[in-house]
């Protein structure tokens, strides 16, 4: 793969790699996405079109970073998974706040801007929850999603129809205002 592609394999091949992950505002992918968001907002704002933006939940980001190995990590090294989820939760909040700053930039914000996200609202994809038992979601997903919701005020959840067994756990989350289940 060339230098202009995003990763296609898990970044954390080794657990020790977690310590090298940084939230770097100068990261080229972070800068490119913020630039693209800024461009979109500037060009759609005059038409009052909302820019919807959802984010990985901490559990989904942890899976993207670790891959399928996270499922054995649940059993073999839950302490590592919690460290990874703590990083993923901080990364989700950091990234979503940066995106909200672009979406709600002075001069471009309008009443429809906060369709899915904003300074006080966040939408999270909980796709990986459908591959977890309710008890695993309760331990590894919910506490970190709750911290993200608490950081923003209101939360929305997106999940897939393969995961209705986890919906009762979603309903226990404080500040959740919407659950979107898609096929």
Each language-model region and where it sits:
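A contiguous, low-structure linker/loop signature
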Residues: 1-19
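Active-site loop segments of alpha/beta catalytic cores
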Residues: 2-4, 22-183
């Amino acid at each position: 793969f060339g230098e202009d592609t995003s990763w296609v394999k898990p970044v954390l091949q080794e657990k020790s790699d977690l310590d090298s992950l940084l939230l770097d505002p100068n990261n080229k992918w972070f800068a490119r996405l913020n630039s693209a968001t800024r461009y979109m907002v500037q060009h759609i704002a005059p038409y009052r079109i909302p820019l919807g933006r959802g984010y990985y939940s901490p559990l989904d980001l942890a899976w993207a970073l670790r891959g399928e190995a996270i499922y054995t990590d649940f059993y073999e090294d839950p302490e590592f998974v919690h460290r990874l989820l703590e990083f993923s939760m901080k990364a989700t909040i950091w990234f979503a706040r940066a995106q909200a700053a672009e979406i709600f930039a002075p001069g471009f914000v309008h009443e429809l801007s906060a369709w899915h996200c904003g300074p006080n609202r966040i939408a999270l994809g909980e796709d990986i929850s459908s591959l977890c038992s309710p008890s695993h979601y309760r331990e590894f997903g919910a506490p970190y999603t709750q911290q993200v919701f608490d950081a923003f005020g209101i939360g929305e959840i997106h999940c897939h129809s393969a995961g209705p067994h986890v919906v009762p756990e979603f309903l226990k989350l404080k500040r959740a205002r919407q659950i979107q289940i898609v096929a």
